[in-house]
Amino acid sequence: YKKVEEATPEASTAVFYIGSCLAELGQYEEALNYFFKLDFIESNCVKAWRGIGWCSFISLKYEQAMKYYEKIIEHKPLAIDYMNAGHVAWVMGNIQKAAGLFGKAITACGTRERFLEMFHKDEEPLLKQGIREEDIPLMLDLL
């Protein structure tokens, strides 16, 4: 993808995949640069906003993460968007907002089981962000 970027630096698909690869490698700050570039190249680019939201969350930039998740929710939200926005609200200490967003994620998933499957995949990042392990079942009981 880097070679494609060298040849066509404005190729949005390459920019997206480079950002995604960097995020998968845990290079969130560098990935953010690519997602911001994609947001600049394509206006109202929800997939750029998703990348910015997640990388910002992992990088402890919670206000920035919430800003982008709120933009997504105003446009074309998926269940994962509500869930990730819920994660951000939770680590920011807004339990009521988090529970509401998780509730919307459950509705968007179609079943509680599908939501729980997605949610449990994010337990490690939640713990790294300061959510206590014993609080996870308590949050799930609220839903």
Protein language model annotation of sequence segments:
Residues 109-143:
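Terminal, low-structured helical/coil segments at or just beyond the last alpha-helical repeat
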Residues 74-77, 87-114, 140-143:
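TPR/TPR-like (Sel1-like) alpha-helical repeat modules
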